[in-house]
Amino acid sequence: MNSTFKVVFNKARGALMVVNEVTSSVQGKGTKTVVAAAVAAMIAGVSGSAMATETDTEIKATDTALKATFTKAETQDNVASSLIGTLGDKLVLKNVTNKGMYAAGSLDLTASSADNVVTLKNGSVSNFSGKVTSTNHFGAVVTATTGTLKIDNVTFENNKFDEVKTGDNPHNGTRGIIRAAGANLEVAKSTFAGNEAVLGGAINVWSNGENTVKITDSTFTGNATKSHGGAVYITGSQVETTIADATFSKNTSGKQGGALQLAGAGETTITNTTFSENAAGTFGGAINATGTKVAATNVTFEGNKAASADGHGGALFVDGQGASYTQAGGKFVGNSAKKNGGAIRVQDGADLALKNVVFDGNTAANGGAVDTFNAGAVTFTDTTF
């Protein structure tokens, strides 16, 4: 059943949002973002005080996704304009410059309850650029805060957002190109290439609740961050993550987790996945698992590196009480660290258990294959060095 919604500029969030027509208000009387199934909004080139045009545009929404919709948004001074086009189940967004996002992102997807699902399918999002202009606000290309966001066969390419200078705190600024903050996230058959953001070059998951992340049959190539998580950043002790049949290659981070940063995340499962030629400045050329339990099966780490003079764990860095990494099958080949643990570094109470794993040609100043420091239980079964 179709429902009618209205495009409204939310001045406090600095973004266009789609709201239930009955509850909407463009006079700032507390617009409520209630959407039966899917909400899409975008703003281009708008500062925090600029007002967008065409706030009365009506769109139709079905139970699963927006259909046959074109919405144009312009700044007061016509610095830039942008276009959302959703044709059937196909989404195409490209060549957009956003000069000043606040809390909201370019595409703000909201479900009316935790049971609802928002789906992006069969499309591309490319060449977005911009920056967040306010401390502690976290714009992204796509933001989801409730329900479940599904991304199916979508390409995100060359979307780049500037870092906000807020002292030494790495957690301010643009969090991922995809940001799930309190929402479940499912990514399937999708590609993330050449994206840049502050925490998580492609995906950021940040939750205080029981949420799930599922990434399957997807590719992450050449994504980057100056901070943590070159491709993916996940935090939240109750967030359960599953990664399967994925490829992470040539992603980079200035600090930790060249491909994947797990920062106090919940239980994480990685299966039939390859990490190759990823690089981090300090900890975990491919994966940094801090305070996180990871169970891996048939995972390959090849040619990853912790590149700085203080580089630890060319492929994998596992840290902290309660943290653990187990792997059955797979290999660590040609990984390197400038300092400790050419393939793996385990420290400060973290556990490591490997079975049927092969190490070959890994290098470091100390511990060419594995280096430990005040680690918990470390076991190797049928493992080749």
Segment roles from a protein language model:
Residues 71, 88-99, 119-131, 148-162, ...:
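Right-handed parallel beta-helix
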Residues 67-84, 97-117, 129-144, 158-181, ...:
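Extracellular beta-strand/beta-solenoid scaffold signature
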Residues 48, 52-54, 75-79, 151, ...:
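Low-complexity, glycine- and small/polar-enriched segments
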Residues 5-7, 54, 59, 111, ...:
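Assembly/interface hotspot detector across virion components, adhesins/toxins, and nucleic-acid enzymes
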Residues 13-15, 65, 117:
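A generic structural signal for beta-strand entry/edge sites
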Residues 1-4, 8-52:
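Gram-negative bacterial Sec-dependent N-terminal signal peptides
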Residues 10, 55-72:
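Short N-terminal segments immediately surrounding and downstream of signal-peptide cleavage
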Residues 53, 85-87:
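Ser/Thr/Pro-rich, intrinsically disordered low-complexity segments
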